[in-house]
Amino acid sequence: MSITKVHARTVYDSRGNPTVEVEITTENGLFRAIVPSGASTGIHEAVELRDGNKSEWMGKGVTKAVSNVNSIIGPALIKSDLCVTNQKGIDELMISLDGTSNKSRLGANAILGVSLCVARAAAAQKGITLYKYIAELADARQDPFVIPVPFFNVLNGGAHAGGSLAMQEFKIAPVGAQSFAEAMRMGSEVYHHLKILAKEQYGPSAGNVGDEGGVAPDIDTAEDALDMIVKAINICGYEGRVKVGIDSAPSVFYKDGKYDLNFKEPNSDPSHWLSPAQLAEYYHSLLKKYPIISLEDPYAEDDWSSWSAFLKTVNVQIIADDLTCTNKTRIARAIEEKCANTLLLKLNQIGTLTESIEAANQAFDAGWGVMISHRSGETEDPFIADLVVGLRCGQIKSGALSRSERLAKYNELLRIEEELGDDCIYAGHRFHDGNKL
């Protein structure tokens, strides 16, 4: 079944910034998708096309991307008469229309909105759920489906919050739950106890939340954050069942080959900046003291040698985000140089569903794990919930149990788990190997 109408408009993300919504119409009805955006974006990501007109939306308008859907992509798709179930053909057509290596002409935000819409329309055409359709596209097993472990970002720092804390995300993972529903309850309880502790230790404003829903107290160090998180876990009685993850996002504090954990201070003393080896020692001290099972972006996006040296010394999950940017060329290099053991997959880093699926399978083929991720500028669109189940990734991060744009994904996973019943399993302690379960 071919597409009869394509329409894009400007809507707003969770930070109040403009973003692109796309609608596609077929004989089966109308289908929508909204594109998210990041704050700590990697320089190697596909280009999110912004207007740059400082007199409107502070330069963050997306009218160019919207126009590219309405005047270029839409007419070309309708003229092509490609069936909506030809995901690869449609995505390749848009890539060809763009004609650049990073989607800078039409914008990854324009192309992705159409790509996700097409998948929804195709699932409806085939009369199956979106996650089942994605599983078919990826040639992934469906017997049983795997429901992911949620990595809740319960405490925000770095570019996602105020305060002086350098590292961006402190996450909890209910690996000891028996189901996603139980994981949600456990996460909710820990999160609310953490809020209470934050207010007690840092005052009422410490309960305020960052971009991704986590509390954002004016904490100085990672140890302060981890102490409070572990205390909240223990209060709930979940010691050993709820583990911890960190996303350092250090590209924002990488300076002259060193890492400035005091980067939010304008007059930070360079003599206190850490060398890659010193930062590794710091990570090892945290790993010894806290129940950390996952480190994301321990080093900057082009500090390749530090990544590979560090991986040799640890036995926890090391996630590549800014290093790889869901880009097949960079993923291949990271695999070759043994820089990480897990890929963070963000749809808008690469810009089409087809390329995202290819990136996931590339990682799986190398024995890596894959974590599906939201962005800090999110929307109510729950597409990644279907994506993580369809790809059997076993793990997802979509922020804290706060803010509706975060809960939209988690609530959709609750529905999927309930719908599948005995035809699904919760990844639990084997979150890294979801595709092998």
From Swiss-Prot:
Q: Which UniProt keywords apply?
A: Glycolysis, Lyase, Magnesium, Metal-binding
Residue positions binding Mg(2+): 247, 296, 321
Q: What EC identifiers does the entry list? A: 4.2.1.11
Keyword Lyase listed: yes
Gene Ontology cellular-component annotations: cytoplasm; phosphopyruvate hydratase complex
For the ligand (substrate), the binding residues are: 160, 169, 296, 321, 373-376, 397
Q: Which cofactor does it need?
A: Mg(2+)
Instruction: Write out the catalytic residues in the record.
Output: 212 (proton donor), 346 (proton acceptor)
Q: Which reaction does it catalyse?
A: (2R)-2-phosphoglycerate = phosphoenolpyruvate + H2O
An example molecular function term from Gene Ontology annotations: phosphopyruvate hydratase activity
Q: List the disulfide bonds.
A: none
Which PANTHER family does this entry report, sorted A to Z? ENOLASE
Put simply, this protein is called Enolase-related protein 3
Native organism: Saccharomyces cerevisiae (strain ATCC 204508 / S288c)
Q: Which gene encodes it?
A: ERR3
